[in-house]
Amino acid sequence: MPRPLSKSRNIRKIMLQMISRRHGIVGSPHFQPLPQATVESATAPQVDIAQESAAVSRRPVMAGPGTGLISQPDLLTLQRAPFAVRVLSHLTAGATAASIAEFNALGADDSARLTAFVDQQLNPGAIDDSALETRFAAGGYTTLNKSLTQLWADHRIITTDSSAPARETQRAALIRAVFSRRQLQEVMVDFWQNHFNVAIANGNAAPVYVHYNRDVIRANVFGNFRTMLEAVGQSTAMLYYLNNSSNSRSGPNENYARELLELHTFGAENYLGFVNPFQVPPAPEDPAYPIGYTDLDVYDTASAFTGWTVKDGRNGPSTENDGTFVYRQPMHDAGPKLVLGMYLNPEQPALKDGRDIYDRLASHPRVAKFICKKIIRRFVSDRPDPSLIDSAAAVFRANWQNPDQLRITLRHILLSNAFIHGWGQKNRRPFELIAAAMRACGSDWNIKAV
C-alpha cells in the first residue's frame, strides 16, 4: 500500500533528489513560492450569505434611458411558487400538471412529500420507464442498446455511419428529459456528463458515445464517486478524448492527468502552481492530505496512467481491435512517484499506480468539498451556504467507499433547509429551458434518429 510521506529529514532529502532527477527542477529558483493566501484561505472567515444578500437588496436600483431597469424595485419581487412547483423545477426537467398532482399526493405535508419524492427518484430501478423504449423504437433508434464491442465493430471499424451513436445519444437526451419518469436520474446524468465532459463531436469518441453515456455515466449516477472515476478513466471515449490512449513512458501526455485533477476532482480553486511539494501545507480538514495539488502532482499522475489504453490494433497486436480498455505494461512508466504527499513504490502491479491515485483523490477532503459545492450550485444556489457545503462534504467523505455514496450525499443536500427554502436563485440553461417548455405544453411528439 502507498504510504504518506514521513517527516524524517532523510526521507525528504531522498524524495527531493528523486524529483530533481525526474524533473530537473528541485533546488533551482524555478519553484514558485507558495502564496500566503493558500495558507490563509483555509482559516479565512466565511462570508455571511444572508447578510450579504440583504445588503445587496438594500442597494438602490438605478434607472434611466437605455438601462433596461425600472425605478420601482418592489415590482421586481416575485411571489413564491407553490412548494410542489419549486421542488419539481429543481429536481426534474420542469413541473407539469400531472407531476404536481402526483407530488402533492405523496404525503400529508410538504416535508413528507419532499422526502417521499426524493426517495422515490433516488431509486430509479423501481420506476417503470418502459414507455421510453417504445418511443426509441418508433423513432428508429438502433444504437442505444449496442454493447461496446458492437459499437466498435459497427461504427469504428466500419466507418460509414460513425457518428450515429453520438447523434442518437444526443437526441435521446431530450426525449428522456421530457418524457422519462426517472426525472432526477436524467438531471444527474446531465450533471455528471457535463462534469466528465467528452465532446460529442470528437471523431474517436463519437462511435462509442452510447457506451460512455449508458455504461459509464448512467450506470454510476447514484453510486460511488471512486467507482465512477475509474470507469471514466478506463472508458474508450475518455481515453481518446484526453489522449491517455497514447500516454506512454516514451511519449508522456499529461492532458488526462491535468483534467483529472483540475476539472474532475479538485477544481482550479485548489491548484497551487509550480511549487515545491514539501512546502505545501496540510489540509485543515485532515492534515494527512495536502491542501491542494501542484504541477508536479500532474506530472507524476500522468506517469501513473501510462499504459492505460484501448485495444484498437495500434498499441498492441493488430488482432486486438475491439475498442475495450487494456493495460499495456511496456508503455507504463514503472518508476517511483510522488502524488499528493503519497509515495508510490516502483514496479507496482498492473494498474496499481493509477488506482492508488484514484483512492487518494476520492478520499481527499478538498475533493469532497469541490464535488459537493458543484452539486449544491446545481440544485440550490450559485452562492451556497458554506455550512451546507461542509456538512455535505462530511457525508460524501465519510461514505467514500460506500456503493451508495452519491445517493446518500444527494439525499442530504435535497432534504436540507437550504434546498427547502430556496427559490429564484437559478436560471435554466437552453437545453433545460426547451425541455421545461415541452413538458409544460404536454404535447406528444418524438424525434427521429435520422
Task: Label each region the model flagged.
Residues 157-161, 166-186, 190:
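Structured, charged N-terminal subsegments at the starts of enzyme catalytic cores
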Residues 2-28, 47-49, 64-157, 161, ...:
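His/Asp/Glu-rich metal/cofactor-coordinating catalytic motifs and the adjacent surface-exposed loops
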Residues 184-188, 200-208, 251:
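Short, flexible active-site-proximal loops enriched in glycine and acidic residues
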Residues 56-59, 64:
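Short acidic, low-complexity intrinsically disordered linear motifs used
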Residues 27-50:
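N-terminal intrinsically disordered, low-complexity leader regions
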